[in-house]
Regions:
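Histidine- and aromatic-rich ligand-binding microenvironments
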Residues: 6-7, 40, 101-102, 123
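Short amphipathic alpha-helical segments and helix-helix/interface helices
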Residues: 25-30, 108-109, 124
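Short, well-structured N-terminal submotif of metal-dependent ribonuclease cores
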Residues: 1-39, 53-69, 140
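Short, flexible helix/strand-to-coil boundary loops that buttress conserved ligand/catalytic motifs
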Residues: 15-18, 51, 96, 131
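A generic structural signal for short hydrophobic patches within well-formed alpha-helices
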Residues: 11, 44-47, 89, 127
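Acidic, PIN/NYN-like endoribonuclease modules and their adjacent C-terminal/linker elements
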Residues: 1-3, 109-140
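Active-site neighborhoods of divalent-metal-dependent phosphate/nucleic-acid chemistry enzymes
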Residues: 3, 49-52, 74-120
C-alpha cells in the first residue's frame, strides 16, 4: 500500500480551521487512511521554528500554536515521524549534483525516496528535477 510523506505546507493547510482549508486538500486527505501519512523530522523542525517565532511575537497565539504542535507531534503523527539517516544523507547528496537544491526540500525529497513514498506538497516546482513521485492535493 502506498505511503505518503507530507511537506510542511500540507500540514499548515490542514491546520486551518473551518472552511479556510482548501477543500481539495481536505477531500484528498479524507479519502485515504491517515495511518499512511508520515512527516519528516525536517517538517518537525520547520513547524517548531514557526511556533517559536509566534511565541516570541504573540505569546497568546504562540501558546495555542504550541498546544497544536505538541498534539501533532505526540499523538497525530506518533510513530510516523521519519528521521534523517545515513541513507537519507547519501540520497540527498546525490540530489544536489549537478543541481543544488536549497534548504529543507532536498532532505524531505530524500526521505520520501528512501522510504519509497509519494511526496505530498503544493510546491511542485521545488521538486521538479528530483525523481520522486509528487502529489499536489490542491490540484486534485
Amino acid at each position: 500500500m502506498k505511503k505518503y510523506l507530507f511537506d510542511t505546507n500540507v500540514i499548515s493547510e490542514l491546520r486551518k480551521r473551518g472552511d479556510r482549508a482548501d477543500p481539495n486538500v481536505v477531500a484528498w486527505c479524507n479519502a485515504r487512511d491517515y495511518d499512511l501519512y508520515y512527516i519528516s523530522v525536517v517538517t518537525l523542525f520547520e513547524l517548531e521554528l514557526g511556533v517559536l517565532q509566534k511565541e516570541r511575537t504573540d505569546p497568546a497565539q504562540g501558546e495555542l500554536l504550541r498546544k497544536w504542535f505538541v498534539n501533532l507531534r505526540d499523538k497525530v503523527f506518533k510513530g510516523r515521524i521519519l528521521p534523517i539517516t545515513s541513507t537519507t544523507a547519501t540520497i540527498n547528496a546525490s540530489l544536489n549534483v549537478p543541481d543544488r537544491h536549497q534548504g529543507a526540500d532536498s532532505w524531505i525529497a530524500a526521505t520520501a525516496i528512501e522510504n519509497k513514498m509519494a511526496l505530498v506538497t503544493r510546491n511542485v516546482k521545488d521538486f521538479q528535477n528530483i525523481q520522486v513521485e509528487i502529489i499536489n492535493p490542491w490540484d486534485c
